[in-house]
Amino acid sequence: MRFQSIMMLTITCAGTCLAEGLAPSDQAYRPTMTGLKSRLNDPRPLSTATIATSSERFLRFDTVARDTAGNDEERVGPSWLAKVDGLMHKMVTSSLSAEEAQLKVWIQSQIHPRELFGVLSLGKRAAKLDDNPDFVQWLRLVKDFRANNGNQAFSDLDIYYLLLKTNSPEQLKLLFETLRHTPGMTKIGASMEKSLSGNWIRKALEQDTYPTIVYNTLRLKDAGTKLDDTPMFRQWLEYVEKYWNKNAGAFFGDTQMLTLFQKTMTEEEDIIKLVHMLRNNPGMKSHADKLERYLLLTSESSHKTMADVWLKARETPEEVFRILRLAEKQTAAADDNRMLNLWLRYTQTYRDKIDKNAFSDAEALQFFRKAKPLDFDWEIV
């Protein structure tokens, strides 16, 4: 078969390098940034097993039937296979190392880095930021692809969110710093660091750019459940604060912000955790409290989850009382009663799980009466 013929050519190409003393195919790669840097500069070819496996995955790729989640392995059609077949024949007759030959095949085939990411299954087995040879080769392809097609053809944000699927923001920060100090990779490393620096805030403020537009421009929806960990989200929160200070009474408010979060994360628990996290930001604390109360009033299912989040954060009954703003007179007595009952239940749970000496029933009632004298609108049950 044509596929088997190409595979034999790939293995033949790798065999030449094996004779020169390659490491065993099962050699472990140390998960260190030093290892990554050395691989980026190391002219040695890949192991036979790695080349054969990577090439096999490459040859099975079909750009028409591609899953954006990284499950990109479908059989190719005759035209794609013939194109790669010809390229592989040319590589066999060259004096390039197996690693260089493989990279040249990818470059000449004009495969997109996002597609190759799926072909190599980097999304499945994680693009660990170490000396993984497939990942190193992918970085080299990205560099060449951007040089030939411009950075916007595969932008810094494209790279960031693709790698964020399998790595933490801290790991990515270290990767880009390493690339900036790696010969041949300094340009892409510097570009990535600049894109994550937050230099855009001043210009966006000058233009009074609507926060939703900024959110979408930064593609924060792509961060998913890692939204809170991404530097761009922290920068966006800073921008929103400054936007509010500059544009008092701006249309963009708490509910618009919550809508963005709900479009980014589908699970209510993740949204509640994110909203409560906003309380750690002094400029966002009051907005977070409003959002928590809004969620409690509009979603019965949020009550238990919210209480669990409070418990995990070890919020005291006094602090939860302030979050619920029970000392304030509300427009609807029924809402007040719901919030009061929620607070009383939380106080009991806090006493059971956190501090058995905190707030007896009598103390809770005394605290409440002191904070808000009872009137006829209230019914404690």
From Swiss-Prot:
Signal peptide stretch: 1-19
Induction (free text): Expression is induced during host plant infection.
Stretches for region WY-domain 4: 251-299
Gene Ontology CC terms, in alphabetical order: extracellular region; host cell cytoplasm; host cell nucleus
Main location: secreted
InterPro entries with a match to the protein in the record: PexRD54_WY, RXLR_WY
Renumbered ranges of motif RxLR-dEER: 57-75
Effect of residue 379 to P: Impairs the interaction with ATG8CL
Keywords: Host cytoplasm, Host nucleus, Repeat, Secreted, Signal, Virulence
Spans annotated as WY-domain 1: 97-150
Region (WY-domain 5): 302-354
Domain of life, source organism: Eukaryota
Motif interval(s): ATG8 interacting motif: 372-381
Recorded family membership: Belongs to the RxLR effector family.
Subunit structure: Interacts via its C-terminal AIM with host ATG8CL.
Function: Effector that specifically binds host autophagy protein ATG8CL of the ATG8 family to stimulate autophagosome formation and subsequent autophagy rather than blocking autophagic flux. The pathogen remodels host-microbe interface by co-opting the host autophagy machinery which plays a key role in plant immunity. PexRD54 competes with the autophagy cargo receptor Joka2 to deplete it out of ATG8CL complexes and interferes with Joka2's positive effect on pathogen defense.
This protein's name: RxLR effector protein 54
Organism: Phytophthora infestans (strain T30-4)
